[in-house]
Structures are given as C-alpha cells and as structure tokens.
C-alpha cells in the first residue's frame, strides 16, 4: 500500500523572503573554508569509505547511466554527435564525441559551478569569477578528481506511492522522501550518495 504521508499535490510557491531564509538555513558557504571547492564531498572521509566497504555482501553491479542518445527527440533535442576521425582498419579506429550533457536524457554530474542564486555561487563567489569564456574557473568536476566512495541509499518514491512511475506533472516533496525512507526501511545520512527513483524511464517507455 502507498504511504499515507506521501503526496501528489503541487507544493506551494515560496515567497522571495521564504526562499532567502531557506537558502541561508541550508547554505554551506564557509563551512570548509572560503577557498573550498569540494562542498559536501568533504563529508566522505576515510572512515566513511571504510564503513561503506564493510557493507558489501555481493559483487552485483548496478548501472545508473543511460545510453547516449544518437538521435534527437523531445527529451533529447541535442543528441550525441559522433565523428570517425580515422576510418577503421586492421589495427585501430579513432573517433570524436561531442556531448551536450544537460539534455534530460543524458547522465551527468552537476558540479558546484552549475547553479547560482542571485548571481552568486558556492561560498558566495560571483558568477563572473566562477564562469570563464570557455570553461569554469572554479567548482568544476575536477574538484571530484579523486572520486568518491561511500554508502549509496535508494529512495524509491514510486514504490512508496504504490505506482509504477510518477506523472510528468508530479513533484517529489520532503514527505515523499521521508515516506520512501520508511518504505525501504532506510535512513539517509550526511555522507550518503542518494539515488531517488521516480520511474521516469518507465514512464517514457509507457508514453
């Protein structure tokens, strides 16, 4: 059965003052120093990695990526561009791949340089200081160059609602996440990698 605390109602819009208060309450600006570029990746330390490794019971691999779209569609208007630089021969073939990573069909990792609030990014840095003419000056994916290994937690919002997938106009709320925790008998911790399942792939297939 669906969790009675989960909701399909559209969350109300926040006022500017409420959004400002929420931003300040959740902000990590200065938490790890003014020059930090890792953000909450700092929470993943050696002890976290040891605890995560101790949880492994099976050698199962769970892929989270999606196939790269090579044809345009409404959900992937900018498909991957493939170009063969050196024709296949007896020994090798070389290609070039151009990716627009922010299509909704493309698996990617957003960094701290991706979003800004009132013209400022992580640690209060102005956008003009973060974004260069061709690349990020700060907060790029290079901040995660050492990788991250931690416990992964799945919150299955669709299963908690007892539906195969959420409709396109439905939202995931705090109540949904808490209901999914109860449904999966898990609790999300500060150093966990969170995976939220809404059934989007299933919905796209069904539609």
Language-model-detected regions and their locations in the chain:
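Active-/binding-site microenvironments in catalytic and ligand-binding cores
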Residues: 1-207
